[in-house]
Amino acid sequence: SFAAQAEITLLKQDPQAGDPLSRLNFTVGGSIRPQFNNMTGDGDKGSYKRNGFDGGTRFRFAADYYLFDDISWISYYELGVNIPALFDWDHHYADGARNTSRRMLYTGLKSNTWGQMTFGQQNSVYYDVVGAKTDIWDYDMLAQAPGNGINGDYDGSYRSRKMLKYKNRFGDADVYASYLFSDSDYLPGNGLRYKRKGGGSL
């Protein structure tokens, strides 16, 4: 697979007295990720993965609003787009695949002194510490927690909703902590029902 990436700063933060908009830094970016897989010779001939599919195209929007001292209010939204499904390109996406997905949506406070506290759908502590450093090639995550649990976006191993997360650096140590709040039932479509009551990571 290969990707084309870009990020543009639409508003650059430069706080000025009497100008609330000058406190805002706003960026947009993303990556387009076409992918081709040929893992089993002719055994998968004609499959959408062999024909070419979307390997995780996403577009992101990030805002950083300076409040006072070294404290900022931050917000982040990342939209996943399945381009072949969006344009209905036959044999280039899985049956039933959605056109778009909400990859992340969170908000919170950031401080160089006190750290960062955010709430919403965001990368897990596990992904920040392990996944982000090893998720380099296609299928790297199959052997990680998100590839082995019921659903990484639900069980807390990847990008769970309703997550409160804190991170900060103390000397040479990076500290990450999170708490997962109860979520609605997850129905994978195989007759099973999962219910997340809570959870946490450190």
Regions inferred by a protein language model and the residue ranges of each:
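Solvent-exposed loop segments that connect transmembrane elements
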Residues: D42-D44, W89-G96, S184-K195
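N-terminal periplasmic/intermembrane-space "pro-region" immediately following the signal or transit peptide
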Residues: S1-S31
